[in-house]
């Protein structure tokens, strides 16, 4: 049985409103105005349209689910996949990852087993790829399966960041540090991580002003170190972003740019044409220190540093960890910050 995107039993979770009027849906995170704002910045534009942190939800007892995708495109040369979570009677989640979709483009059907039996109605959540883009043309379940709509979730955590927040470079949507802590803290989240983005307050204003947020985390600054011209503006732009966050959030956390191997002259010498040398490492260190000094003037902002090991082997491409590294990031943040009881459901 194939359900079209217009079927009300399918619930789409995305920061932007979902247009169900056509035979396909794209789960968008950012409004068009942000694309216009960042025009000319090649890195961010390639990542703005990903459906990182977006999902399809339904209640079913089908033993399998097929996600029908079209116009699947890959923007980075790393493995990408979708993933399925099935809620268990005790409230935990059984997880299933797809194979690597990087080997496919265009029209792709992804079959995911649920392990469910007839009459065993459970909440199922299908998570979209972290970096690749696609439209959803439908979801299929077994012909005799029962299907109901899953209650919508109101997000209570806004995660603002760059490629580390987006999840570069892990294959599974479940492996990003945001997803790990979303489940641990029981805080439905909007993941607004954008690989390559600078500290751009106006790119996130719309999200911060969308509602009152119990928690906002910000993990930006590394990309300001790529050029000398963007180092000096980092602290001032951070202050503008923090002012916006404090006006719209109960708790604000800033994760400073983590250590990079190039700061010690280690790791690869370049990343997609960008030099990873000591000069670049020195600029990132300067940005980190400038942020530390400026953010110290905000007593209510929790500033967290050094969330990743100083070991170049954790960063295969010189900048990003794999799933194990994201687990370490999540563990470190959880050990040093706890959302208030009012935030956690």
Would you name each region that the model predicts?
Residues 264-305, 328:
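Substrate-gating cap/lid alpha-helix
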Residues 181, 200-235, 259-264:
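Oxyanion-hole/transition-state-stabilizing segment in secreted/luminal serine hydrolases
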Residues 1-157, 265, 271, 275, ...:
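N-terminal secretory targeting modules
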Residues 315-345:
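Histidine-centered active-site loop/cap adjacent to the catalytic His
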Residues 248-252:
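A short helix->loop->beta-strand "cap" motif at the edges of active sites that frequently abuts
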Residues 190-197, 217-227, 257-258, 288, ...:
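Cell-envelope and extracellular/periplasmic
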Residues 233-236, 240-247, 286-293, 328:
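Alpha-helical scaffolding segments of alpha/beta enzyme cores, especially the outer helices
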Residues 126-195, 203-212:
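Serine-esterase "nucleophile elbow" of acetyl-processing enzymes
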């Amino acid at each position: 049985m194939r359900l079209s995107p217009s079927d009300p039993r399918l619930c789409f979770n995305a920061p932007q409103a979902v247009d169900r009027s056509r035979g396909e849906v794209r789960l968008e995170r950012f409004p068009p105005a942000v694309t216009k704002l960042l025009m000319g910045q090649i890195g961010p534009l390639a990542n703005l349209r990903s459906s990182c942190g977006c999902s399809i939800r339904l209640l079913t007892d089908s033993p399998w689910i097929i996600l029908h995708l079209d116009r699947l495109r890959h923007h980075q040369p790393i493995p990408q996949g979708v993933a399925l979570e099935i809620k268990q009677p005790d409230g935990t989640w059984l997880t299933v990852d797809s194979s690597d979709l990087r080997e496919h483009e265009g029209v792709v059907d992804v079959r995911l087993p649920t392990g469910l039996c007839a009459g065993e109605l459970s909440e199922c959540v299908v998570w979209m790829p972290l970096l690749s883009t696609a439209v959803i043309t439908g979801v299929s379940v077994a012909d005799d399966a029962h299907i109901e709509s899953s209650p919508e979730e109101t997000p209570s955590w806004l995660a603002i960041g760059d490629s580390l927040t987006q999840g570069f470079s892990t294959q599974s949507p479940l492996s990003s540090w945001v997803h790990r802590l979303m489940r641990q803290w029981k805080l439905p989240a909007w993941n607004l991580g954008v690989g390559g983005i600078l500290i751009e307050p106006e790119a996130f204003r719309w999200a911060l002003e969308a509602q009152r947020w119990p928690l906002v985390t910000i993990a930006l600054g590394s990309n300001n170190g790529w050029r000398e011209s963007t180092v000096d503006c980092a602290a001032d732009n951070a202050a503008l972003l923090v002012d916006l966050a404090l006006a719209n959030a109960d708790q604000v956390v800033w994760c400073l740019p983590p250590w990079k191997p190039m700061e010690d002259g280690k790791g690869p010498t370049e990343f997609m044409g960008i030099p990873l040398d000591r000069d670049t490492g020195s600029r990132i260190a300067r940005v980190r220190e400038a942020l530390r000094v400026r953010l110290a003037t905000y007593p209510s902002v929790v500033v967290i540093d050094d969330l990743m090991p100083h070991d170049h082997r954790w960063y295969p491409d010189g900048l990003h960890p794999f799933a194990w590294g994201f687990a370490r990031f999540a563990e470190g943040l959880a050990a040093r910050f706890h959302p208030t009881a009012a935030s956690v459901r």
